[in-house]
Amino acid sequence: MQVYGCCELVRELYAQIGSGDQAYVPQAISCAVRALNDVAADESLPKDVREKAAFAAANLLISDFEDK
C-alpha cells in the first residue's frame, strides 16, 4: 500500500513526519502493533472495527519482519 491510498489523516501525518514536524518512530512495526492492539481492546468501538484491528495486528506479529 502506498500513502496515496490512505485516508487524509494518515497522509497529513506522513507529510509531517517527512518534514520533521512530527517524530519518526524507528520501530514502526512495534508501534503499529501497539496501536492496533489498543483499538482491538477498546470495547467502546464497534466489534467489526476491533476485529479488523486484531486481524491486522495478528498478521504483523506472525510475519517474518522484525524491528531492529
Swiss-Prot record:
One Pfam match: UPF0253
Family: Belongs to the UPF0253 family.
Protein name: UPF0253 protein VIBHAR_03255
Source species taxonomy: Bacteria, Pseudomonadati, Pseudomonadota, Gammaproteobacteria, Vibrionales
